[in-house]
Every structure is written in C-alpha cells, then in structure tokens.
Amino acid sequence: MSMSDPIADMLTRIRNAQQVEKMAVSMPSSKVKVAIAKVLKDEGYIEDFAVRGEAGKPELELQLKYYAGRPVIEHIERVSKPGLRIYKGAGDLPRVKNGLGVAIVSTSSGVMTDRHARAKGVGGEVLCFVA
C-alpha cells in the first residue's frame, strides 16, 4: 500500500511513541526523513538516529529523548501537506513559540531550521513545527 504523506506518518509515529514513553521508534527510511532526523538531533529533540536494514527496505530508527520523565518534544505538527503546500520566503518564515521551537524547512540548500534558513537568506517549503 502506498502512503500519501510519509512525513506526516513519521511525525505521528514520533508523537505516538512518546505518549507511551518508548525509548526508540522505527519507520521506513527516505532521504527527507533522514534529513529531518538530523535536524531534530542537531536541535536536541532526539538522542540519536540510525538507518538500518537491507538495501531494498532501509529502516530509520530514532532514539527518543526525555527530560524529568517528560518528552523533550512537547508539540510536533505537519504544516505543508500534499494537498496544500506551504512555501515561505526567507523574511516570511514563521517563528515557533517566539523562537523557543523550530520550523523545519526544505530549501534549495537542503533541509534546515527556520533560523538557519533566515541566516542563509533562503526560503522554502515549511515541513513542520517542533517545540
């Protein structure tokens, strides 16, 4: 069965795993999912990630992070969807929780946070909000 929105599936798996306090969650891997996982790790929202499995069906495994018994990711939300893509210029990129959260943006320079995109002066598709 084909999946219409693999990024939304990734975010839902993370949200569900953290609600039941799992230490790790796995999902089918793709280049965009690995790039999102790298941003989440760089920003301190997950412990680590790894791509495992055979060449035909790689699996992305995320090690989730908790602080004082609570998930570090309080809120994770898909913004741009297959039926309604959301593109923003460098000056129009949204700030999440007044800068306490991040917007993950897919730009021509790769997947990065809203802060990095603003610093580079590039806009792109707003994939999700994380706080």
Curated annotation (Swiss-Prot):
Superkingdom field: Bacteria
Q: What is this protein called?
A: Small ribosomal subunit protein uS8
Q: Which UniProt keywords apply?
A: Ribonucleoprotein, Ribosomal protein, RNA-binding, rRNA-binding
Q: How does it assemble?
A: Part of the 30S ribosomal subunit. Contacts proteins S5 and S12.
Q: Does the keyword ATP-binding apply?
A: no
The UniProt family comment states: Belongs to the universal ribosomal protein uS8 family.
Q: Which HAMAP family match?
A: Ribosomal_uS8_B
Among the GO biological process terms of this entry, one is: translation
Q: Which InterPro entries match?
A: Ribosomal_uS8 (IPR000630), Ribosomal_uS8_CS (IPR047863), Ribosomal_uS8_sf (IPR035987)
- Cystine pairs annotated here are none
Record-level GO cellular component terms: ribonucleoprotein complex; ribosome
Q: What does this protein do?
A: One of the primary rRNA binding proteins, it binds directly to 16S rRNA central domain where it helps coordinate assembly of the platform of the 30S subunit.
Entry keyword Phosphoprotein: no
GO terms of molecular function: rRNA binding; structural constituent of ribosome
What single Pfam family name could you report for this chain, choosing any that match?
Ribosomal_S8
